Every structure is written in C-alpha cells, then in structure tokens.
Amino acid sequence: MKLYEQALWFAGVTVEEKRFMSENQSSAPIAENKMGTMPVGKLVFNMSLPMMISMLVQALYNIVDSIFVAKLSENALTAVSLAFPLQTLLIAVATGTGVGMNALLSKSLGERNFKKANKIADNAAFIYAISYIVFLILGFTIVKPFYASQIGNADVEIMNLGIDYLSTVMIFSFGLFTQIFFERLLTSTGRTIFSMTSQLCGAITNIILDPIMIFGLLGFPKMGVTGAAVATVIGQCVAGIVAGTCNHKYNHEVSLSFKGFRPDISLIGHIYAVGIPSIIMQSIGSIMTYSMNRILIEFSSTATAVFGVYFKLQSFFFMPVFGLNNGITPIIAYNYGAQQRKRMIRTIKISLTTAFCLTFIGFLCFEGIPQVLLGMFNASADMLKIGVPALRIIGIHYLIAWFCIIAGTVFQALGKAVFSMIVSIMRQLVVLIPAAYILSKIGGLHVVWWSFPIAEVISFIASMAFLIRIYKTIISKIPEGKL
C-alpha cells in the first residue's frame, strides 16, 4: 500500500459508510482530500489539536497522581517513581502491538478486504489477551525482585509500598490492554475523536478517584499508595469500556467475532513484525529509567524521587509535542506520496516552530520556578536542595529537544524509522547512561544531571545529520507542487 494511502486511512479521510461495503467491492477513485488541499497551518491545527489535548490530559493525570502520592510521604513518591520502568514496559507492549495491528488493518481496509481486517482484529485481541496473562503472572512473581534489584533490602518501607503499587497495576492491567486495543481499532478507521474521548474519560476518572482512594474520602477506606494504583486501573477500565462502546456503535468497518476462532500464526507474525520495533523503541525508556534509578539510589532515595518528579513534569511539556507528531505524520506522509514538496516543508516548519514554543515554556518553568514545581510534590528541604539545581540543569536540554522530536517524526513519515531508532538508542542508552555513570564517579550528584544536556546535544547533531541527508536524497528531489 502506498505511503499516502496509509496516511489517508490514519487520518480517516477515505472511510466510507457501511452501506457501501462488501467483501469484494473495489475501491473507488480517491478524490483530492484535505491533506492535499487545506491550508497547511489550518490542517496541522485540525489534525494535531485533538491528540495534543488528549496527551496533555494524560500527562496531567500522571502528575496529579504523583502529587497526591507525595502528600503521603517522600518514600511513597520514591516507591511510585521506582515502578516507572516496568510500567513503561507494560505500556510499550500494549501500544507497540497496537502499531502492528494498525499497520495491517490500514492496508486491508485500503484494499477493501474487510474479511481479512476482521481476522486481523480477532488475532490482535488474542495477542492482547495473552499479553495480559503474561503481565498478570509477572505481577505475582517479578515485582519484589525488581524493587530489590534497584534498592536492595535497605529500605523496607519503600519496597513494601512499591510492591503494593506495582503489583496492583500489573495484576489488573486488563483495563489498559482493553483500552489500547479498542482505541487502536478506532484510530485505524480514522475515528480519532472517539479515541480521544475514551482517553479523557479514563483520565478524568483517575483524577477524581485519586484523592478518594488514597486518603479515604466519601466513606472509602484509606488505601494510600495502593489507592493510587486502584484509581489508575479503574480509570483504564472506564476508558476501555468507553472505547469498546464507541467501536460497537460507530466502527462499522471492523467487527469482532470469535465464533470458531483459531489463532492465525502467520497474521500474528505479521503483527509482531511491525509491532516489535515499536515495542523495542518504547522499551528503551524503561531500560534508561531503570539504569538511572540504579545510579541515583547510590546517592539517596531522595535523588530517585527527584528523578521521578522530573519525568512527570517532562511528560507535561513533551506530551503535547508528541500529540503534534501524531497529527503531522500522516500530513507529511500523504504529501510525500502526492509529490507536494512545498506542503511537506511548510508542515515541517510549522511543526518545528510549534514544538519550540511548547518546549521553551518548559525551559522557562524549569529555570524560573523549580521551587514551585517541586513544591507541588510536597518537597522536603532535602528534596528542594537536590531538585532545584537538578531541574535547572536538566531543563537546558529543552532548548534543543524540540528539534530532535520533530526530526524523528519526519524520519518515520518518510519511511526512515531506523534513523529515529538510532537517535533514540544513542540518546538514552549509548550516551546518557554511560555519561551519568562516569559523572557519578568523578563528581557529586549535581554533576550527574549534566548527562541529560550532553545526551541531547549528541542527539541534536545526529538528528541534524540525518535530516540533511533525507533532504538531499528525498525531499529535494520531490517536485515543488502547490502550497
């Protein structure tokens, strides 16, 4: 399937009504659509805003979750922060599998092979069920060794709090897998508004339940850190129910039927062929946070808590940029296929400007009001002493991170995802972790934080080199076209 045709399906501009569908129906000619005709600025806004809002709300509820946990104690905040690597892995498996499912679904829908599309959805549901069973087992078996590998047995309170939190999240992760499965089905047919709606419902549910479950309000028992986990999984279940309902009512292109179902090993293999690279890409963050926790815990548990707070705050400023990415990917891909260089370049320029503005706000906050940011998490005097310089040092990388993020999106949209993978691995594993380890040995804790700007500078250089290469070999050879 051509790249611009896939982009059309992700954007939902070629989805026809159910009454026109039949298994053997040939595809009608594709008329000019908004991605080739709408003014680029308006198009980027329309395509990106829903995902930006959705991801901003997701980031907000992650922050609110930690703010409430921090009111319990610094140890509680540290325990939740240490859970991040496995939580990241959990999300990576769910979303990466969804990427593989979406790719095959989009191709089958573009070919108007609805029988195959339904079969892909059935097999993807089977994969999600098996994935949940795996994490269910891990939730009972691996959580304690996981915490012990990061902090040893020195701090029993942190370990016990962490085990309660992470076990709950993993054992009841069926809500997360259900949510992402149905949201990806909606996305594959262009119904992103319903995907956003389900995410908002889940996030709002989580935000409302957090204080109730954690502090025992409205007659509920005080559950502490476990309450935060319970609120999270209930929010995921609500999002899954909403997404499933929207699929049943509005997604007429894909239907699920498990009557006489047998797993198709070939289809499952194709789903993973596309999904595993995405899982690996997202899992890099899991390895990075685990390794950083190991380095920082050598100084103090407070240092680990500061790192956890930084990650929550970073998500708030970066998630809207990632939402922008989701919006511009099909625009760039479509206009690449349609040979419209002016529209491609205009899209990239608008995206770079928007991403810079968003991350510059983060830079100003990290440099100007770190005490306020840390104060939201009930920071102790020790946490402020460590956290204020840490946020100011790490915040420097916001000045160039915007470029690396958008460049990675351009690579993926033009079919050069390997460049994104190289830059991501370079930033998070090849440079960041070794730099942090070396700096931890030759200087104090405040020196370790410089590993983040160092890694970003190297990533910036690599991204620039790859982008120049892509411009010379691909973009410059495309006809200018109309704007």
PLM regions and their residue ranges:
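Transmembrane helical elements of multi-pass membrane transporters/channels
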Residues: 46-65, 168, 202, 235-239, ...
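Interfacial/gating helices of multi-pass transporter permease domains
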Residues: 46, 69-88, 120, 156-161, ...
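Small-residue-rich hydrophobic transmembrane alpha-helices
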Residues: 77-137, 176-195, 306-364, 368-370, ...
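Short alpha-helical transmembrane segments in multi-pass integral membrane proteins
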Residues: 2-48, 105-174, 221-276, 332-397, ...
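Short runs within selected transmembrane alpha-helices of multi-pass transporters and secretion channels
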Residues: 98, 168-187, 195-203, 228-243, ...
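N-terminal transmembrane alpha-helices
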Residues: 35-67, 71-72, 88-100, 104, ...
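Helix-terminus/linker motif at the lipid-water interface of multi-pass membrane proteins
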Residues: 56, 60-78, 147-156, 212-223, ...
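Hydrophobic transmembrane alpha-helices of multi-pass small-molecule transporters
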Residues: 89-92, 136, 206-211, 240-244, ...
